[in-house]
Amino acid sequence: MKKIFFTAISLIFILSAQAQDATHDKGVIINGVKWATRNVDAVGTFAATPESAGKFYQWNRKTAWAAEGETVENWDSTYPEGTEWTAANDPSPAGWRVPTRKEQATLLDAAKVTKVWTTQNGVNGYKFTDKTTNNSLFLPAAGYRNDSDGTLSSAGSYGAYWSGTQDALGFYSGNADWNDYYHRDGFSVRAVAE
């Protein structure tokens, strides 16, 4: 009997670990959209925790840029082409993708989702909570990399998350909304389920 019990407990730990490793995420449904609980990190992986910045990406490019350190080398300051983020350039892990603006809009639907600037485990960001299910999603204010030279800016006070359609969800303590940014900027990516 003990052997069966320990085998069952071991299996639970293994399945739990697999559900939240670098390439797997259980996700959370907010206003009908299944969001990853962590930012995209290196191509095809998730950051370690919901508060981790992950990596920054330029719009419709698959090169990952560090979210730490003042400057980076070999920053690509050319303007990306296209009007939609292509699947070939999507840095998300398998089963996930860069969200559309319409999917990002579900987070800002005040009738169905509350948004609150907060600090979670010492990290500033926005917490979006589904009013029906009480599920919540934390987006860290990871800052961004400047379009002209890749200099890190506003970490801890500003967050920007690319959509697949040439704009981004940007926020600071007083507001969260869309803007049409320079596509050469390096922003976070929070994936949605395919």
Feature locations, PLM:
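Bacterial Sec-dependent N-terminal signal peptides
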Residues: 1-21
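C-terminal, surface-exposed recognition/capping segments
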Residues: 22-194
